[in-house]
């Protein structure tokens, strides 16, 4: 597959892998999230829908892979462009991978531990119910810290490094640089917002929509009809 086409596909896929779980969560499993109510309501919802719940967080794991893929793709495609900084792009990839690792662990807790605790909560009586609620509270804070706190912060660092590196490419569109800056600032803003259930869904959705718009802008820019635009996404072929 030509390098230009591969880059387009990877960036579009990355956006889709994040928008799908966002929609799935909002439509199907929001009642089990921190925005869904108190612990009793959340646990009962998860206990009643364990497969649907776990599937949602498996989809979020796919979103994690997509985000790391997008940073890796931009590193691979843009590192040799005139003015770009390969060191910044490489560092961005490292931060994205570290963030992805933390995110995957947090999501894995959601997939495996939440349904188990929810089933125990529904089946048990006092004082077992209180113990289960305490464990759920601890696990909930841990998974939130890993996915929403640590991962989002590392993603922010990775994203900012990419934005800076791309901004140094001579005629890279400045409006895409600005859009990228806003997108990654929104990601940073979503980090504390996850601890406030009333605003968390809006903060996370805004960050992901802006991130996807940024990727889309890069894809469209790379799909320009002028050869000078398209050539930036193609490898330098040897001349004979």
Kindly label every feature range from the protein language model.
Residues 1-240:
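Hydrophobic, aromatic-enriched alpha-helical segments typical of multi-pass transmembrane helices
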């Amino acid at each position: 597959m030509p390098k230009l086409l591969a880059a387009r596909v990877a960036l579009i896929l990355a956006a889709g892998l994040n928008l799908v779980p966002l929609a799935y969560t909002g439509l199907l499993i929001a009642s089990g999230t921190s925005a869904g109510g108190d612990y009793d309501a959340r646990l009962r919802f998860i206990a009643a829908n364990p497969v649907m719940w776990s599937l949602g967080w498996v989809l979020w794991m796919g979103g994690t892979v997509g985000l790391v893929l997008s940073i890796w793709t931009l590193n691979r495609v843009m590192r040799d462009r005139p003015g770009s900084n390969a060191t910044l792009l490489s560092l961005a990839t490292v931060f994205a991978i570290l963030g992805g690792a933390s995110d995957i662990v947090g999501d894995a807790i959601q997939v495996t531990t939440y349904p188990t605790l929810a089933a125990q909560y529904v089946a048990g009586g006092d004082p077992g119910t209180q113990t289960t609620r305490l464990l759920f509270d601890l696990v909930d804070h841990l998974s939130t810290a890993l996915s929403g706190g640590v991962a989002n912060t590392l993603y922010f660092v990775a994203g900012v490094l990419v934005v800076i590196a791309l901004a140094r490419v001579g005629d890279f569109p400045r409006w895409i640089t600005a859009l990228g800056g806003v997108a990654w600032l929104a990601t940073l803003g979503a980090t504390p917002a996850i601890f406030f259930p009333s605003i968390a869904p809006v903060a996370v959705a805004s960050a992901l929509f802006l991130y996807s718009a940024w990727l889309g802008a890069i894809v469209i820019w790379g799909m320009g009809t002028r050869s000078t635009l398209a050539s930036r996404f193609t490898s330098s072929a040897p001349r004979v």
